[in-house]
Amino acid sequence: MVVGIAHYLTVSAVLFTLGVFGIFLNRKNVIVILMSVELILLAVNINFVAFSAALGDLVGQVFALFVLTVAAAEAAIGLAILVVFFRNRGSIAVEDVNMMKG
């Protein structure tokens, strides 16, 4: 059995769907929303790599590497902001984050 591009696209679609459901079904926890965004970015990266391998072009794989770098920085900055916000307010609920001034 050969693993083709359809298998990779199926896995990517499942991960993308899980990420979208995670965002829409959980509106209270910011950490779960950040993890759902990371799932969506992972699904996009799988698409880039799958099409890059199928077409024999390395541009998609390089772009996926850049997306992974930006996603790691986004996760680190987002979690750092949440830690500071939790220390100041004692909660990381979305309702509390929406009440911020500035």
Curated annotation (Swiss-Prot):
Localization per Swiss-Prot or TrEMBL: Cell inner membrane
Chief subcellular site? membrane
CC annotations in GO: NADH dehydrogenase complex; plasma membrane
Q: Which GO terms describe its biological process?
A: ATP synthesis coupled electron transport
Which reactions is this enzyme annotated as catalysing?
a quinone + NADH + 5 H(+)(in) = a quinol + NAD(+) + 4 H(+)(out)
Does the keyword Transmembrane helix belong to this entry? yes
Q: What is its EC number?
A: 7.1.1.-
Family annotation (HAMAP family) = NDH1_NuoK
This chain's protein is named NADH-quinone oxidoreductase subunit K
Q: What is the lineage of its organism?
A: Bacteria, Pseudomonadati, Pseudomonadota, Alphaproteobacteria, Hyphomicrobiales
